[in-house]
Amino acid sequence: EEFLGRAISHRRSEYFLASKCGHYVESSENDKKGNSWGESDLRDKEWTKKTLIESVDRSLRRMKTDYLDLIQLHSCDLDILQEGEVIDTIERMKEAGKVRFIGYSGDNEAAEWASLDSRFDSIQTSFSLLDQGAKDMVFPGVNKTQKGLIAKRPIANGAWGADKSPSTYASEYFRRYEIIKSNGIDVDIDLSPIELSLAFALSHQNINVHIVGTANLSHLKSNIKQIETEQLLDEKTLLQLYEVYDRSNDNWVSQT
């Protein structure tokens, strides 16, 4: 956030600026040490009005702006969502002009519930050819309530087609890929594994934003080219990828 503040605060009108709240907030003792995160026992992780306000105010301060276009409750459990205080608190900040839109970022039952709640303007949830649960659990509510839909991890962290897990973060996706591969993948298409992964996500046109992170400029250019050329999958290929996922699925849940 501090990086963004330095880079774009003077060009604020050019950007749709989104952030999340509900993650760890540093204590005053931690701040004095000059440590951005500190030890876990110095973190306040309660879903309270106080910590939510502090989290949003911190984002505004760090990004050198007086409002966020989108604030997202990040991985808030279903029972906390249903209590209502967290949403009420964010709504008060919206009324105060600190945020324009309210979103939920998470997965599974909590995302399904949030997808049907009219107070949320958008849902950010995991979706890829190795994480298809949101298609049946979250997409219907988003479509019904006409929310914005943001797909995180849309290329499954590069696990599809990999020889080994690309990272610890991708280990569950790689495990799923190994199972799917052992069950037989009958997809005849002239795309690299990453291109196939991105094409699968892009072929779901109810998704408004795909979060495809990279630190490699050539990868970024390749992704942009694929989007510009509208390199999508036909219905037959999509159905094949749905089928092999469903056939391999052993109660898989969406990964946060």
What residue ranges belong to the model's regions?
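Generic structural signal for well-ordered alpha-helices
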Residues: 1, 5, 56-60, 87-91, ...
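Glycine/proline-rich, positively charged
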Residues: 30-128, 203
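N-terminal binding-site loop/beta-alpha segment at the start of enzyme catalytic domains
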Residues: 1-23
